[in-house]
Amino acid sequence: MATFSQKPAEVVKKWVLIDAEGLVVGRLASLVANRLRGKHKATFTPHVDDGDNVIIINADKVVLTGKKYTDKKYYWHTGHPGGIKERTARQILEGRFPERVLEKAIERMIPRGPLGRRQMKNLRVNVGPNHQHEAQQPEVLDVAALNRKNKGNA
């Protein structure tokens, strides 16, 4: 039997809805990254965008374990000399765009390159309980029920 290689025209994408309230960031990000890449499917082909469309709601209510809430730092550079900047996870989660903690965690688990950028476009992260994709009839995925460690204590 020959090795199976999926063609882009044969891809069937599902819509998945995940409620992130009370879930641990890293565990959720790992699961979502695998869904976006399509690694949960038997038809996975490394060079084809085979993943599902993922909608995450309540991204501002995620949980960080240990002291990461106060100690984890996010760095970026402005491009100017001496322009290294940093913020803690707490500052970001309490700031204007709290969904970025989850977005960055997922983005950093997906390979960098043209295919990774295309797969990241299949991710929609929302701060509140509402989303604009009711018409796609997303299937609800209960991440907390998959493993007891997925749910945070806080």
From Swiss-Prot:
SUPFAM superfamilies in alphabetical order: Ribosomal protein L13
One cellular component (GO) term of this entry: cytosolic large ribosomal subunit
UniProt keywords, alphabetically: Ribonucleoprotein, Ribosomal protein
Gene Ontology biological process terms from the UniProt entry: negative regulation of translation; translation
InterPro entries: Ribosomal_uL13, Ribosomal_uL13_bac-type, Ribosomal_uL13_sf
Sample GO molecular function, one term: structural constituent of ribosome
KW DNA-binding (keyword) present: no
Domain of life the protein comes from: Bacteria
Record flagged with keyword Acyltransferase: no
Function statement: This protein is one of the early assembly proteins of the 50S ribosomal subunit, although it is not seen to bind rRNA by itself. It is important during the early stages of 50S assembly.
Family per record: Belongs to the universal ribosomal protein uL13 family.
Binding partners and assembly: Part of the 50S ribosomal subunit.
Protein's name according to its UniProt entry: Large ribosomal subunit protein uL13
